[in-house]
Amino acid sequence: MTPPTSDTPLDAIIGKDEFAAAASADSFDAELAKAGAHVTSRWGMALFLAKRYPLGGVGLAIVVIFVLVAVLAPYITTHDPLATNPAISLAAPSAAHPMGADFMGRDLFSRVVYGARTSLAVAFGATILGVFFGVLIGLASGYLGGWVDLATQRIIDMLQSLPTLILAMAMAAALGPSLTNTIIAIAIPKLPSIARVIRASTLSLREMPFVEAARAMGMSEMRIAMRHILPNTLAPLIVLATAGLGTAILVEASLSFLGLGVPEPHPSWGRMLSESAAEYVRTAPWLVIFPGVAITFAVFGTNLLGDALRDLLDPRQRTSN
Amino acid sequence: MPDGAVASPASPASVPVLEVRDLKKHFPVRKGVLRAITGHVYAVDGVSFSIARGQTLGLVGESGCGKSTVARAVIRLIEPTSGEVRILGRDILALTKAEMRICRRQAQIIFQDPFSSLNPRMSAGEIVGEPLLVHQLGSSKERQERVAALFDRVGLRASQMNSLPHQFSGGQRQRIGIARALALDPQLIIGDEPVSALDVSIQAQVINLMMDLQEEKNLSYLFIAHDLAVVEHISHRVAVMYLGRIVEHAEKRALFASPLHPYTEALLAAVPIPNPRLKRQKRLVQGDVPSPINPPPGCHFHTRCLYATEQCKREVPPLLEVAPDHWAACHLRQPKADLHPAQANATVNPSSTRSSAPA
Amino acid sequence: MNNVLETESADAPAKSAAAKTVLEVAGLKTYFFVRQGIVKAVDDMSFSLKAGEKLAIVGESGCGKSMTALSILRLVPDPPGRIVAGSVRLDGRDLLKLSEAEMRKVRGNHISMIFQEPMTSLNPVWSIGNQISEAVMLHQNVSRHEAFEKAVEMLQLVKIPEAARRAREYPHQLSGGMRQRAMTAMALACNPHVLLADEPTTALDVTIQAQILDLILELQERLGTAVVLITHDLGVVAETAQRVIVMYGGKKVEEAAVVELFEAPLHPYTQGLLAAVPHLAAMSGLAPARSRLKEIPGIVPALVNLPKGCTFAPRCAFASDVCRNEFPPYETKRPGHNVACWHSNQLDGVRHA
């Protein structure tokens, strides 16, 4: 016999009907109502969410800061990240150079700031590319079924059997080092997981009565896929995509570290590490610390944000299990 | 062929809203890597009935009898393997996709599970208005008005139009489903166990609503259920299905007062009655329902039937009019033979079951 | 089909009048502590059960009937739930005071439970014979071989054909009705004093339901087990119970002998339920069909936002101010018939068919 355990969801014990009413009629919406009229503004809503999911708020803040830093790079730096100045080679952090200078005399602060541009461009680019094609493949595979599904799944299997970094390295090596090639090389390993998740959602949604109802009213299959299936796959997708940002940053750093990623002249945190880690870690530790901390915080921020998004989106999806 | 139009005096010559002839749906069973077909699930195996305007046909049976498959085949949510389905006289199986789309306005469906029959990401108003959008009926403003009117009609407040499904209770969601089905003003609504998942007190509300709507709009219902009491309440005619075939079909009172098929007898005998003073004498059937992949030869019910003969094991009994407008598929209930005393009652209205206090 | 039914006089269950009390629940409260607040799933539930008696607890979804049974067996998920008050005395011993180890000796042994969904309640990777023998070996000092023989014996008792062969089969090889029989066999293997049956037939077809109910009644009589049948189906209640408790919103609102409850209910909710159930007119000789069913307006309340006062007041036709302010006391209005309602006097005789 399997008696309910502490993992048994409440709505299986108390009864779906009034658990759903209890869980929804109060928590989010009631709290929202309690927060008052000013919540209807977008800022109000943002503040309300930040209060309810503090860690997510922190994550979002970090991500936003990085984005701002990347966008406003020219305005917050005083030096050209590419300008070399042998006179100040390996200079320690000072007022003029808040993060010191590297072995070529380049201002580390501006390199880190412009490195944010690179990292974010690659991360967002790869994620968007991966999501776009992943959704397309997953949706088609799940909805059409048959041999399309079979063939696609085998290809996805093959892609997924290779470790992300190895695959990215192979692609980058094959395509050659450049910004766009890095984006592609990182996007491709993302495809399988996204396609899988979308396909799984599609398969279960396809059988739902509300999809049957849509067919019964004469809706075309394409419209059903766009209007009924896709929006209901968004929740796990958003979580996956946000967490994927962090992975993309890491992979880019790794690729650049190995020399396969973003080449000169774009500053890249990973490449900064590879240039200085072995030789200068004891003599000029700031060359390793600052890029390393930047990578860490960026990934940390995206992970917090991803977790909070999952918490936010998942419980409300529970009513349709 | 059982024809509902004959039984109802209201519409003597009008075309039946739904007419089904020898409907079959066989699902192939595929096994192995190459997915070879090793057999079939005979989900629906030759079903015929018709529903007249403003009438309700209750389709009852236990799990595996094929009633849900019939519900879907009849509006081509599942493609029938063979047979004929006419909605308002038109053979829908011969229609192209575009023509079928227009025909769908005549027949809509309500589902059993109030939780999964509504898209959780769409507001209630959007859900109800979607059929109008798909068929491009009216301007945006007109659609809004129609949705508000529908909400009102099914007992919901127009202020709830922007709420999401999870904010409603089960009974309210079912009302949303009904409003959606009504949006295109169909003649026929198929209810696939529409009240089975609701609490008793809510069931009553929804049943009453459906009956009111029927009276108001002269709707026809194909009401599928396993709860005999609910079916008896809402139907005009009742058909009993067993393993893909209709075994009995009659006007409601005749069927419940004097069932002719042993399975119907057994079903009625098995229903627990909310009256502690009445005790059942004996159960009329043992054993489990056979699998629809390997149905028994001859009469499907012979493995559990108390009266089974050799003929029952070999020959499939045809659905015959054993008594006026009372059809049964049983070798022991022939129109000519006079084997069972119950049959004699079929032609006479058993008045003893009618005398009762009004509700 | 009049020859199938016969009218039975409402004789009191005389034999159980002298029997001893085997289960006594007093003031049981089970609350769930969730983010939204406190869900009072079971609020002050009390009843007693005599040896061999058949008690039905009836109510709609969320009324707390299942949770009552789980509380008796101390299977409430903790967190978020907890039994916060009350006592559950089995043969005099308070189960709520036992340690978990002692409680394990009671479950399956002195009190058993069968659940609604036999597929998920049986372990899919063990044969049913093994599952039953496990229950036997846990509580009795017998060898594995003897336990398995006992398991086969139990399967024969629950009328599974070819019991010896079936005992080696797995749950997925059995039909729904068979699985429910197997679960019943498992529950009764150690001859418990009390059997809790939580909606045992809801998931089954009506012909199988009838078989299972017959089986439970037959076994109950043969083994002398007291049965608490939890259900929402009033037909099942009428067929099987001797005494009925009606629950609403986590509270007990009425308790009476079965015939009296059906013929003269004293609580508006009970009366509403009875009027809302469509009856097979031909079978029960009641109102003609195609009339409107009597509705109970409104919806079942969310257990976390229960109104002050009587939980049924928002839907009750007789509700007055006192109803909305204070939950009515539980009183004995007639011998053996208790109800919690301020206006039960008004209902006397107002039974709608």
Place the predicted regions along the sequence by residue.
Chain A
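Generic hydrophobic transmembrane alpha-helix motif, especially the helices
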Residues: 98, 102, 108, 129-208, ...
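Transmembrane alpha-helices
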Residues: 117-133, 168, 172, 222-254, ...
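Short hydrophobic alpha-helical segments within the ABC transporter permease transmembrane module
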Residues: 111-115, 120, 155, 162, ...
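Gly/Trp-centered helix-boundary motif
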Residues: 1-135, 139, 146-147, 161, ...
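Glycine-rich helix-loop "coupling/hinge" segments at transmembrane-helix boundaries
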Residues: 160, 171-175, 186-187, 201-202, ...
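Residue-level recognition of transmembrane alpha-helices
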Residues: 63, 111, 153, 169-170, ...
